[in-house]
């Protein structure tokens, strides 16, 4: 991931300590604690350098996903960020995960989130969902990543788009523009809006953008 990447020589100067939990979390996350559960995964399974390390020696490319599922129970599916996949292709991945407690967490297509106004993305959004629904029970939360240039000035546009999404699906939103994190009232307002829609927010732990590692 290039976002937040810094030169290795500068890493020693970075304070990697996690921030304290803000007091407003109690108002945004009220109610009883649920049963804890952890899903662990990477951003892709097609890593040739894992053959002979994570994957058995001589593992063929067509078997990478099958081997990946032996080690992890989820994946941040970046592939769907760069291309809208049809139900046939998604169905093949879903079949490999059959019988496993495994979740595919597709990232929304960047043609929706990174190009132009969100109001004009009805067709692309429907096509994106048409494909990922083929994951069936293996469909995990959908990650909606907004670019570093998408700031709070477009808040109303963003919230209107999020409210239009299916209420029976789980979404996590990632914002990157520094202004979301610079002003506590702006960030708190965002968290409250997401909580009202039963949506989560992504926490990004990266060296060059410690502000995104919120709690």
Segments (PLM) and residue ranges:
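Residues lining hydrophobic/aromatic ligand-binding pockets adjacent to catalytic sites
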Residues: 1-215
